[in-house]
Amino acid sequence: MGRGRGVSSGGGQSSLGYLFGGGETAPAAKAKPAAAAEKETTPAPVKKAAVAAAASPSAAEKMKEIPAGIQSTQANNYFRAQGQNCGNFLTDRPSTKVHAAPGGGSSLGYLFGGK
């Protein structure tokens, strides 16, 4: 009475209840009394000039946060490796980079009976 590979005995509790509607829901948060909520949301008076100055740092301060040698913009922040072995350089060994799309032409004709 052996089970085959990949055969489950069934049952058990799943952690994927959010996908399959698995019964238990999160308990609802208790509502605070309205009077207490109003007291908590009333902020102390603050000067608008101090808030505006703290919220928007100057361009010089923003430049200080960027590490030296990094030239980037907010729109293009992808990391590009820059070292002696990056880009076009000559070696005495063939490249292992894949030059053909899947299902397309291939330089591996010696394996697959090339055309």
Curated annotation (Swiss-Prot):
Q: Which domain of life is it from?
A: Eukaryota
Region (Disordered) location: 29-48
Tell me which UniProt keywords the record has, alphabetically: Microtubule
Cellular component annotations (GO), alphabetically ordered: cortical microtubule, transverse to long axis
Which BP terms in the Gene Ontology apply to this protein?
A: cortical microtubule organization
* Similarity comment: family membership: Belongs to the SPIRAL1 family.
Q: What does this protein do?
A: Acts in maintaining the cortical microtubules organization essential for anisotropic cell growth.
Q: Does the keyword Coiled coil apply?
A: no
Q: What is this protein called?
A: Protein SPIRAL1-like 2
